[in-house]
Amino acid sequence: MNWRQLRKIFAFYGRFTVSFTQIGYAARRMLWSRVQPDFSGQHWLVTGASGGLGRAIALAAVRGGASVTAAARSAEKLAALAAEAGPALATIRCDFALQQDTEQLLTLLQQKGRRIDVLVNNVGVLLDDFTTTDEGRETSFATNLLTHFQLTEGLIARGLLADGGLVINMSSGGMYNVPLSVRALNAPDAQAYSGVAAYGFHKRAQVVLTTYWQRRHASRRMRFYVMHPGWADTEGVKRSMPRFRRILKSVLRDAWSGSDTAIWLAATRPTQAAEEAIWFDRKARPVHVYERTRHSADTAETLVAYLTAELARLREAA
């Protein structure tokens, strides 16, 4: 590691450690007005709902009066969630690393005829090693971005996302380190693979997609927000960032504080003054903090074109 890399690391952690941890959450929440969510009559779809942030969001939605479809890969964890949540929560097993599984989820939702009022694109993975799915894609790209795009576009195209519906995309503060780069999304080089870097590129793309969707569907009164939870003690952090976790474990956020903004956004649906923003601790924040991430040869349109073509490639092969 050279001096330039060390300087970037020190600058990043120096800037964000207090804000992104439980310390920042505890300080800010003292100034918040109390909100009693009322989600009565709403149906939510929460991805990656079997644990961590997704589980907390699904349970909070049920407690607010919503009915919830919880989708995740682990049938065992989904069963445990359903037992805790009660009859207002239904589960569907879906591996969001796979386009085929996500397509089957869309088909099942269409057959049930259940319109979605709130979609939370929460599922995500941060991996140590380069792996590919059975469909030949880098696993974290497929999970963190491609099937988010597929699911959201599919719900809208099928008329399953209600007019006036809400989409919340779960990003990460890691996106602050990188610009939009379509080329970096589906990492082809196993030798040069960095799970942390790949995760950051996927999460930056989520931010760009959110702005794109909001522009495109504003006439239908749909709301699209992207947020990040701060630094939460998730399974991905435990698995892929053990040193980071060991140093900061005592101040990492739990699932409830990490997911608070998602519930608040759904309950209040605030107006977003800036076209581009990422929500964090109940406030719209800038999507760039470093000048180097503002400049990219790619645009929202090139990103959407790439994801659309990637989905079409597998459909044509089938």
Label every model-predicted segment.
Residues 64-80:
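Conserved glycine-rich Rossmann-like NAD(P)H-binding loop of the short-chain dehydrogenase/reductase
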Residues 43, 50-51:
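Conserved glycine-rich cofactor-binding loop
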Residues 124, 128-132, 163-221, 228-245:
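Catalytic loop of short-chain dehydrogenase/reductase
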Residues 1-43, 179, 297-318:
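Non-catalytic terminal and boundary segments that flank Rossmann-like NAD(P)-dependent oxidoreductase
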Residues 7, 248-287, 301, 305, ...:
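C-terminal helical subdomain
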Residues 47, 114-124, 144, 168-172, ...:
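Rossmann-fold scaffold of SDR-type NAD(P)-dependent oxidoreductases
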Residues 129-143:
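Short alpha-helical oligomerization interface
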Residues 85-100:
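Rossmann-fold cofactor-recognition segment
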